[in-house]
Structures are given as structure tokens and as C-alpha cells.
Swiss-Prot record:
Residues 79-403 form the HAP1 N-terminal domain. Residues 52-62 have a biased composition (Polar residues). Residues 1-62, 212-264, 372-411, 451-529, 562-628 are annotated as: Disordered. This is Huntingtin-associated protein 1. Self-associates. Interacts with HTT/huntingtin; enhanced by an expanded polyglutamine repeat within HTT. Isoform A interacts with ITPR1 and APP. Isoform A interacts with AR; decreased by an expanded polyglutamine repeat within AR. InterPro entries: HAP1_N (IPR006933), Intracell_Traff-Reg (IPR051946). It comes from Mus musculus.
Length: 628
């Protein structure tokens, strides 16, 4: 049995299995003779590097010793015994301890009966001391060793990553090379096929050339043979002639074809081949001539195509130049079109402005026409209204005639007929006087102004109700020429306003002069009438009544007022019909002119007060004035 089995059985069967010396025996250095100089171990190359490397080498040698001891084969065992752990022979092999091991190893291993466990353990200890006199010391692993190992592992990982990358790149390169190799193989196969095809063609051509050369040689040989045959026939003919001279005439002649057939048995086959080859040669020559003609035609066609291509290129160059010129013209036309479009837009804007102006002018013309028609209506109304003062004038004349009667009769009538007999006479007379004064004192121009304002409001409503004309119908005529410089609407309106203002100022001045003349004529009469009104009001307030008034004086004042009013109406009629009245002028000017402020006098104030007091509402409230 091997020492390995003995060690295992000793470790398991012996009583000292728990002894540390038995499991891990401490080997003491064996004292023995000094080794020979030849047997000294050579220094290991790793001993000079440091203590760490020394310890590593020792652990490696210890593990090597264990592996050699526990090994299964006998070869490492014998090598270990005779060479030692470091190469030379062990130091304890010459002593008496291990002297009998090599003679009877079975007695020490445990094959002999009666060997106990302690003896086996002692044997193992002695064997270990003899074989490993200097066992390597055990070393503890430190953090530095761990860091070094981790650093080495990281380096290994990096190396592996780089190797993997290199392998991937190599795989890619290999795939690319494989593809290229496949392509090259396909190209090689196609090249080989082409080579075979070319070889076949070359062989065929060689055969044809050989046949052609053979046919030429055969022709030469046949010519030579024909010449020789002709010479021989001539010779034979001469011989026959000689023989005929020698022989009788009836002797048969020998057949020459039999002799030639006997001499050349393959002549017919060769002649047939020669004919076939000649026919093929003629056919090939015809094909060659035909191919030459075709090549010439192709050359001519190529030349024609080249000429046509050159002509087409020239035409393309010319067309490109024409195209460039047309593009330039097109760009120019585009610019002109844009300019014309801008001008068209400007003209359209001008047309729109002109249309708006024409619309405004049409509206103004319509308004002027309406104003003119209204002025004509007002003129006719004024004429109708002027006929009324004539009637009033006639009434005034009748009143004057009545007033021209002698006063004595009146007084006599007054004295003869007492006032108490006519109780309602003073009241009716006072009422008639008040109504007549109201009619004559009130200015008729007030009613004209009210009528004109009403007409204007109606005209404005009609203009608002009428729809504006469409913008499409407002087209300028064909012969319409736009002015070079248009006058703005603001300036045009300002000019019109200045003109109307000047006309209105002149009209106002004329109207003011007429009104002053009329008031100069009317003022004394108004003063008298107001005086009479004051007297009447005073008498009514005192309770005396209007019976104490002088009727002659009242009627005379009334006739004077009617005469003044008729004169005023005659002055208005004297104005020519074509010249518009101040009211019409104000209407045509686009508005009502401001009237000149009258100078406020005491008489005018009294007239205004009388108008206010004698208004219809006051009349309704007061009732008949004679009721007081």
C-alpha cells in the first residue's frame, strides 16, 4: 500500500487524532552532515525581490510538498525523495532514522501486523522531518495583499475587456474578410469558367488552323501528285505509243484509274474533306466579308452618331443661351409686372378716393338740389304770405277811414250811449287788441325758420333711409384724366367754408341793415303800443277797466302798425327773385347763419315780456282778460 493511504489511516484510526502534533506535525530541523557543494541548492530567482515574494515562494513549496506527498503515482514520490523540495537531495536521508525505509518500507507503512497508531504517527513525523527539514512558515493575509489582489483582478478584468474588444474587432474583420473571400471565390470561379471557355475557343481555333494548314499542305501535295501523275501519264503515253509501234493495233490498253486507285486508296475521302473544307472556307470568307461590311457600317453609324451628338450639344448650348436670355426677359417682365401691379393698386386707391369724393359731391349736389327746391317752395310760400299783408292793409285802410271820422260823434255816441248799456264791449275790444298785437308783434321769420329746420330734419331722415350707391357703379369714364395733384378734402372743405363764411358775412350785414331800418320804423310804434299795453294793464290793475281808454288813439296806433308792416313786406318784394333771401342763403351755405345780436332796448324787453305773458298757455290759464 502507498504512504498516502497509511497517512490517512493513521490520522483516522489512531488515538492521537485530536493531538495537534499528529494532524499538523511541527517539523524540527534535522541535524545532519553538511550537504556536498555539488548538492547545494541554487538560489531561486524570486528570493531577491522581497519578503512578500519569498513568502509566496515558500507557500508554493509547502503546497508542492503536500501535493507530492499525497500524490497517487510513485514517480513524484521517488523524485521528491531523491531530489528534495528545492531540487537537491534531502539532508536527513543519510542518517539512521530513515536508513531502513528503503529496505523494508512495508514494516513502516503498517503492513506488518502489530504496528500501532503512535508508531505510525512517529514514522510520519520522522518522514516529514527527513523530507522537509525547513517547512515554510505560515503567513497571514493582510489588507495590502487584498488590495494587491483586487488591483491584479481589476487589471485582469481590463485585460479581458481589451481582449474581448480585440476579439470583437477581429471577428468583424474576419467577417469582412470572409465576405471578401467569398466574393473573390465567386470571381475566381467566373474567371475559371471564362478561362475554360477561352481555352475551348483557342483549341477550336487551333484545330481550324491545323485543318487549314493541313488542307494547304494537302493541296500542295495534290498539286505535286497531279504533276507527277501528269508526268507519269505522259511517260506512259509515250510508252504506249512505243508499245503500239511494237505491238499490233488490236492489243488491249491497260486502265490508268485502276493503277491510281491502287496507289492512293484514301484519295476520294481526302478529296471529299477538301471540298467540304473549301465550302466551309468560302462560307467563312463570306461571313468575314459580311462582318467587315457590318463593322464598316457600324463605324459609319458611330461617326454619324458622334456628328449628331456634336450637333445636339451645339443645339443644347444655343438653347441654353436662349433660355438664359428668356429667363432674363422673364425676370424683367416680372419686375415690370410688379411695378404695374403697384401702379394699379395706387390707381385703384385713387379711383376709390375719387369715387368717395364723387359720392360726397353727389350727396352735396343732391342736398343743394333739395335746398334749392326748398328755397323755391319757401319763395312761393313767401309770395303767398306776402298777399296777406295786402288784405291787412285794406283792413287797415278801412280802420283808418273809421278813425278819420269826427271824434265828436264818438264822444257823442259815448255820451249818448252809456257804457253800462254795453257790458261786454270793453272786454271784446281788449281781446281783439291783444290778439292783433300778438299777430303783428310776432316776427314771421320765426315761423320760416321753424319750417326750414323741419324741412332739413325730414331731408336728413330721407338721406339716412336711402341706401348708399354701390362702389362698383362708381367707375370713372373712359375720357377721365386724373389730376396730377389732388387737393385734400380738408383744404377743399376749408376753401368752401371760407367762401360760405364770406358770403354769409355779407348776407348778415345786409340782413342787419334791413333789420335796423325796420326796427327804426317800428320802434316808435312799438313804444306807443307798449305804452298803451302798460296803460291797459295799469287800468286793469286799478280796477277802472278799459272803458276809460281813448278808442281813437288805439285805432290810430293800430293803423300805423299795419302800415309799417305793409312797407316792410313791400321792401322784401322789391328784392329780385333770382337773388336768394337771407334764409335761403343760409340754407345753401350749409347751415343757419348766426343772426346779428340786436341791441337790447327797453321796448324790446317789454315786447318779449308781452309775448311770454300772452302765450297760448298763459291765455288758457288767465282766460278772458275782461273777467278781472
Amino acid at each position: 500500500m502507498r504512504p498516502k493511504e497509511q497517512v490517512q489511516s493513521g490520522a483516522g484510526d489512531g488515538t492521537g487524532s485530536g493531538d495537534p502534533a499528529a494532524g499538523t506535525p511541527t517539523t524540527q530541523p534535522a541535524v545532519g552532515p553538511a550537504p556536498e557543494p555539488s548538492a547545494e541548492p541554487k538560489p531561486a530567482p524570486a528570493q531577491g525581490t522581497g519578503s512578500g515574494q519569498k513568502s509566496g515562494s515558500r507557500t508554493k513549496t509547502g503546497s508542492f510538498c503536500r501535493s507530492m506527498i499525497i500524490g497517487d503515482s510513485d514517480a513524484p514520490w521517488t523524485r521528491y525523495v531523491f531530489q528534495g523540495p528545492y531540487g537537491p537531495r534531502a539532508t536527513g536521508l543519510g542518517t539512521g532514522k530513515a536508513e531502513g525505509i528503503w529496505k523494508t518500507p512495508a514494516a513502516y507503512i503498517g503492513r506488518r501486523p502489530g504496528v500501532s497508531g503512535p508508531e505510525r504517527a512517529a514514522f510520519i513525523r520522522e518522514l516529514q522531518e527527513a523530507l522537509c527539514p525547513n517547512p515554510p512558515p505560515t503567513k497571514k493575509i493582510t489588507e495590502d495583499d487584498v488590495k494587491v489582489m483586487l488591483y491584479l483582478l481589476e487589471e485582469k478584468e481590463r485585460d479581458l475587456n481589451t481582449a474581448a474588444r480585440i476579439g470583437q474587432s477581429l471577428v468583424k474583420q474576419n467577417s469582412v474578410l470572409m465576405e471578401e473571400n467569398n466574393k473573390l471565390e465567386t470571381m475566381l470561379g467566373s474567371a475559371r469558367e471564362e478561362i475554360l471557355h477561352l481555352r475551348k475557343q483557342v483549341n477550336l481555333r487551333d484545330d481550324l488552323l491545323q485543318l487549314y494548314s493541313d488542307s494547304d499542305d494537302d493541296d500542295d501535295e495534290e498539286d505535286e501528285e497531279d504533276e507527277e501523275e501528269g508526268e507519269e501519264e505522259e511517260r506512259e503515253g509515250q510508252r504506249d505509243q512505243d508499245q503500239q509501234h511494237d505491238h499490233p493495233y488490236g492489243a488491249p490498253k491497260p486502265h490508268p484509274k485502276a493503277e491510281t486507285a491502287h496507289r492512293c486508296p484514301q484519295l476520294e475521302t481526302l478529296q471529299q474533306k477538301l471540298r467540304l473544307l473549301e465550302e466551309e472556307n468560302d462560307h467563312l470568307r463570306e461571313e468575314a466579308s459580311h462582318l467587315d461590311n457590318l463593322e464598316d457600317e457600324e463605324q459609319m453609324l458611330i461617326l454619324e452618331c458622334v456628328e449628331q451628338f456634336s450637333e445636339a450639344s451645339q443645339q443644347m448650348a444655343e438653347l441654353s443661351e436662349v433660355l438664359v436670355l428668356r429667363l432674363e426677359g422673364y425676370e424683367r417682365q416680372q419686375k415690370e409686372i410688379t411695378q404695374l401691379q403697384a401702379e394699379i393698386t395706387k390707381l385703384q386707391q385713387r379711383c376709390q378716393s375719387y369715387g368717395a369724393q364723387t359720392e360726397k359731391l353727389q350727396q352735396m349736389l343732391a342736398s343743394e338740389k333739395g335746398i334749392h327746391s326748398e328755397s323755391l317752395r319757401a319763395g312761393s310760400y313767401m309770395q303767398d304770405y306776402g298777399s296777406r299783408p295786402r288784405d291787412r292793409q285794406e283792413d287797415g285802410k278801412s280802420h283808418r277811414q273809421r278813425s278819420s271820422m269826427p271824434a265828436g260823434s264818438v264822444t257823442h255816441y259815448g255820451y249818448s250811449v252809456p257804457l253800462d248799456a254795453l257790458p261786454s264791449f270793453p272786454e271784446t275790444l281788449a281781446e281783439e287788441l291783444r290778439t292783433s298785437l300778438r299777430k303783428f308783434i310776432t316776427d314771421p321769420a320765426y315761423f320760416m325758420e321753424r319750417r326750414d329746420t323741419h324741412c332739413r330734419e325730414g331731408r336728413k331722415k330721407e338721406q339716412r333711409a336711402m341706401p348708399p350707391p354701390p362702389a362698383q357703379d362708381l367707375k370713372p369714364p373712359e375720357d377721365f384724366e386724373a389730376p396730377e395733384e389732388l387737393v385734400p378734402e380738408e383744404e377743399l372743405g376749408a376753401i368752401e367754408e371760407v367762401g360760405t363764411a364770406e358770403d354769409g358775412q355779407a348776407e348778415e350785414n345786409e340782413q342787419a341793415s334791413e333789420e335796423t331800418e325796420a326796427w327804426e320804423e317800428v320802434e316808435p310804434e312799438v313804444d306807443e303800443t307798449t305804452r298803451m299795453n302798460v296803460v291797459v294793464s295799469a287800468l286793469e290793475a286799478s280796477g277802472l277797466g278799459p272803458s276809460h281808454l281813448d278808442m281813437k288813439y288805439v285805432l290810430q296806433q293800430l293803423s300805423n302798425w299795419q302800415d309799417a308792416h305793409s312797407k316792410r313786406q313791400q321792401k322784401q318784394k322789391v328784392v329780385p327773385k333770382d337773388s336768394p333771401t337771407p334764409q335761403q342763403q343760409t340754407n345753401m351755405g350749409g347751415g343757419i347763419l348766426e343772426q346779428q345780436p340786436r341791441v337790447p332796448t327797453q321796448d324790446s324787453q317789454r315786447l318779449e315780456e308781452d309775448r311770454a305773458t300772452h302765450s297760448p298757455s298763459a291765455r288758457e290759464e288767465e282766460g278772458p282778460s275782461g273777467a278781472t
